[in-house]
């Protein structure tokens, strides 16, 4: 079968080509913001439009185009949707066994203030999960926990998506940074150092931003000491670990340091006014706490599903475990690799997106045991045994989880179908090249390339795999540091996570907002654009003024 070469400028004018390439994305924005379509409807129509652009404008062969859509849809089911199914199952086990009431009480005993609960659960615990697992699990788990604590589901999902900005670049044991190094031949350690000199600024800003969203300027004034402790300790640990240890552990170290510092601080300090959403006043919370006291053993038992989850996900993420399932590993036979018919190595990526013409691999990996979702399922099984849940109740709970998540799973599949047709047709690369044509202003627009990549794929890792090489090439053309531009792709990417259709679908699934994706998208989109502009300003200053910050 002939190799089909991607053409990134079919119109003969990069700006006109990029305008046509952007049609599916513009429709998706319009469908969610103005038409207020349900997520699965918007995603389905977006795939249809992307297919039309790929076939009619890019002249992609029909079999390649359809194969990329099917490949993307199944990738959405496994491993992405599998993570969400397992994560929601763990949460439901906690609720069904009555343990979540104790979890709620234990958090309330640290602080009844929901602004500070957001810092503890959404930020610290979420960052830890991002460092260990990534790929949607942190938002799903923390948003569900916050709903259980009395948060409005839309706010819980939206705030968790926004606060997840801080740890994404170093997520899943630093995979985004490591991939950026692999595709650019740059030192991953240096890229990690550079990201560690950009993200700490954004981390503290994001936490103050969250307080303002929740409770306005009054909230910022009342919580700033706690924000400085949580954000400051995280930012310092993030800088030190990324610059002196490596890109694998900044999230794990920073989140634990921040959690310990914040918890100890809240033993001594509480805001003057206790903030809660809705009508539940501080006095009612205090009365609830006064009536219910749990032993340390009861609290540890209640938290056991999430302790098991943390342990299994961390075990699954460490290099020796991963090496077992890598090519040449002892358990590599457990991984089922299926080359995608009519697509695998039948599409060629072309310069300047890559250094030389490269056949685009398309191999569907069914890693039934080594997938993160399976690690979370093991945590669920351990929880069932430890909490003495009846097998019939566990099976019923798993069944209800699948039933509730049926539409979100379809949405996630269609979102990934759109991402894959965009990548294999060259549509996403056309948009990237248009941004790279902005000349010396590219330092400002560079993070938008990472933002675009994460919007399309839902992953900072995938964004770097797509665009890091292009960032390095553009940097050399305009005479700025390639390490800085590749780092900007990573840092800019974190700001796109909160509006990625994949992330939106996952968050809605976790908090029971199926069909309300348009509401959540409208909640996060302005914050995403503002943060990306901030990263653009930081990157430009580092490129032309603060050059001493570049390793």
From Swiss-Prot:
Keyword Cell membrane: yes
GO cellular component entries: plasma membrane
A Pfam family recorded for this sequence: Lactate_perm
Principal subcellular localization: membrane
One MF annotation (Gene Ontology) recorded for this entry: lactate transmembrane transporter activity
Topological type in the membrane: Multi-pass membrane protein
Keyword Transmembrane helix carried by entry: yes
Sequence intervals crossing the membrane: 13-33, 37-57, 69-89, 131-151, 159-179, 194-214, 245-265, 306-326, 366-386, 405-425, 438-458, 530-550
Subcellular localization, as worded in the UniProt entry: Cell inner membrane
Protein origin, superkingdom: Bacteria
InterPro entries on file: Lactate_perm (IPR003804)
Reaction it catalyzes: (S)-lactate(in) + H(+)(in) = (S)-lactate(out) + H(+)(out); (R)-lactate(in) + H(+)(in) = (R)-lactate(out) + H(+)(out); glycolate(in) + H(+)(in) = glycolate(out) + H(+)(out)
Keywords associated with the record: Cell inner membrane, Cell membrane, Membrane, Symport, Transmembrane, Transmembrane helix, Transport
Role this protein plays: Uptake of L-lactate across the membrane. Can also transport D-lactate and glycolate. Seems to be driven by a proton motive force.
Family: Belongs to the lactate permease family.
Name the record gives this protein: L-lactate permease
Species per Swiss-Prot/TrEMBL record: Salmonella typhi
């Amino acid at each position: 079968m002939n190799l089909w070469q991607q053409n990134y400028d079919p119109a003969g004018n990069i700006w006109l080509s990029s305008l046509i390439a952007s049609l599916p994305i513009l429709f998706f924005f319009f469908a969610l913001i103005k038409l207020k379509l349900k997520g699965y409807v918007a995603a389905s129509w977006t795939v249809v439009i992307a297919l039309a652009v790929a076939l009619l404008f890019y002249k992609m062969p029909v079999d390649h185009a359809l194969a990329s859509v099917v490949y993307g849809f199944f990738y959405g089911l496994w491993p992405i949707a599998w993570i969400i199914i397992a994560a929601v199952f763990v949460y439901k086990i906690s609720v069904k066994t009555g343990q979540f009431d104790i979890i709620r009480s234990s958090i309330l005993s640290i602080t009844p203030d929901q602004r500070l609960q957001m810092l503890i659960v959404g930020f610290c615990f979420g960052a830890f999960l991002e460092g260990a697992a990534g790929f949607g699990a942190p938002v799903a788990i923390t948003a569900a926990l916050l709903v259980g604590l009395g948060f409005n589901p839309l706010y819980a999902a939206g705030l968790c998506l926004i606060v997840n900005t801080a740890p994404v670049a170093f997520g899943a044991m630093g995979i985004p940074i490591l991939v950026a190094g692999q595709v650019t031949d740059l030192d991953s350690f240096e890229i990690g150092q550079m990201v560690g000199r950009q993200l700490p600024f954004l981390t503290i800003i994001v936490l103050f931003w969250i307080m303002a969203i929740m409770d306005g300027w009054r909230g910022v004034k009342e919580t700033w000491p706690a924000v400085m402790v949580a954000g400051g300790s995280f930012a310092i640990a993030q800088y030190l670990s990324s610059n002196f240890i490596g890109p694998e552990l900044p999230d794990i170290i920073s989140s634990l340091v921040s959690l310990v510092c914040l918890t100890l601080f809240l033993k001594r300090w509480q805001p003057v006014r206790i903030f809660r959403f809705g009508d539940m006043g501080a006095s009612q919370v205090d009365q609830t706490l006064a009536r219910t006291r749990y032993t340390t053993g009861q609290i540890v038992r209640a938290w056991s599903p999430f302790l098991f989850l943390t342990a299994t996900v961390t075990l699954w993420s460490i290099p020796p475990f991963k090496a077992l399932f890598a090519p040449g590993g002892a358990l590599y036979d457990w991984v089922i690799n299926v080359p995608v018919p009519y697509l695998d190595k039948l599409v060629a990526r072309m310069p300047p997106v890559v250094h030389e013409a490269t056949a685009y691999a398309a191999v569907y990996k069914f890693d039934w045991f080594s997938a993160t979702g399976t690690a979370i399922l093991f945590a669920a099984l351990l929880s069932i045994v430890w909490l003495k849940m009846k097998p019939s109740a566990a099976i019923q709970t798993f069944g209800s989880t699948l039933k509730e998540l049926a539409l979100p799973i379809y949405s996630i599949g269609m979102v990934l179908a759109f991402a894959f047709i965009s990548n294999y047709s060259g549509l996403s690369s056309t948009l990237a090249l248009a941004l790279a044509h902005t000349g010396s202003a590219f330092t400002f627009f560079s993070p938008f390339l990472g933002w675009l990549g994460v919007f399309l794929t839902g992953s900072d890792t995938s964004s770097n795999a797509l665009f890091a090489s292009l960032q390095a090439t553009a940097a050399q053309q305009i005479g700025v540091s390639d390490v800085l531009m590749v780092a900007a792709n990573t840092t800019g990417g974190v700001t796109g996570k909160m509006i990625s259709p994949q992330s939106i679908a996952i968050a809605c699934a976790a908090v029971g907002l199926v069909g309300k994706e348009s509401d959540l998208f409208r909640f996060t989109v302005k914050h995403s654009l503002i943060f990306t502009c901030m990263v653009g300003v930081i990157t430009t200053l580092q490129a032309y003024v603060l050059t001493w910050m570049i390793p």
